[in-house]
Design a protein with these regions (language model features):
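Core alpha/beta nucleotide-donor-binding catalytic domains of modification enzymes
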Residues: 1-115, 124-130
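Cytochrome P450 core scaffold surrounding the K-helix E-X-X-R motif
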Residues: 254-257
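Class I S-adenosyl-L-methionine
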Residues: 62-72, 84-252, 262-268
Length: 270
């Protein structure tokens, strides 16, 4: 399966594919191209996956002919969530940041005959948007079957709280289309098998002293600690909870992400 990863960031969807391959050894994929507007994200993606062609081009410039030439069988995407966030202006499709998504839905999905699978991730609230309405209508018109989810990583054994909307779609007509959002995974057998090996705490997700990483680069100085210690959201390796990082992480002290501290196995806060 040849995959096109759009709004690719640092490669989260690609990592998800690799995780799925551990459980489904016969599952084969090839991410043939990744596209994101952020130069910084693209540099990180290239570091993580040096064999993937990474582009900083405008998604609105993609054509059905190009995707057919690349024989794209699947599109994985995480479109900008700002037009749909509950804290934002909720301009939906009137927000210019929705234009690349609309181009995908209106120009690419209906006209790329090789396309058989779609995976989309977005913020909670997308499911109530006009953009969502346009997406599911297009999928139905193009003979896709789809299922939608509102789930949090903690439900999958991952120590992070980040409720998100997911949609999976396929042209496989044997796929059972759901008539409502799924938020309870307790009865999903595949979920039980795939994530039972996951760590329940942060220990396996953080850097250790023997990693090629200089801790001095990210240590908080006494001035910052003295001013903001009471609002820091502190976690340790044994913590079973974390929240997502925002763009303001490193600039603002409160509500932008977790601070990790590791001093032996204990911490005392005055």
């Amino acid at each position: 399966m040849k995959v096109l990863e759009l709004f690719s960031g640092i490669g989260g969807m690609h990592y998800a594919l690799k995780e799925a391959q551990k459980i489904l050894p016969d599952f084969e994929f090839n991410v043939v191209r990744a596209i994101d507007i952020s130069d910084v994200a693209n540099q990180v993606y290239k570091h993580n996956f040096p064999n993937v062609e990474v582009k900083g081009s405008n998604i609105c410039g993609l054509t059905p002919d190009l995707l057919m030439k690349l024989q794209i069988g699947a599109i994985f995407m995480s479109p900008p969530c700002q037009p749909f966030t509950r804290q934002g202006n909720q301009k939906d499709i009137s927000d210019n940041r929705s234009q690349p998504f609309l181009h995908i839905v209106q120009q690419l999905i209906p006209n790329v005959q090789s396309l058989n699978y779609i995976l989309l991730e977005n913020v909670k609230g997308f499911e109530k948007s006009k953009a969502h309405e346009i997406l599911v209508k297009t999928l139905s018109d193009c003979d896709f079957k789809y299922q939608e989810f509102l789930i949090c990583p903690k439900q999958l054994g991952i120590p992070n709280s980040r409720m998100r909307y997911y949609l999976i779609a396929t042209k496989n007509q044997s796929f059972k289309q759901g008539d409502q959002l799924i938020s309870d995974l307790s009865n999903v057998a595949a979920e039980q098998e795939m994530f039972q090996h996951k760590e329940a705490n942060l220990e396996s997700y953080i850097h250790h002293e023997n990693d090629p990483f200089k801790i001095d680069q990210v240590l908080l100085n006494d001035k910052v600690l003295g001013r903001h210690a009471e609002v820091f959201d502190i976690v340790q390796g044994h913590s079973k909870q974390s929240c997502c990082f925002t763009k303001a992480y490193g600039k603002y002290a409160e509500g932008t992400g977790k601070e990790n501290i590791k001093i032996g196995n204990t911490i005392n806060l005055a």
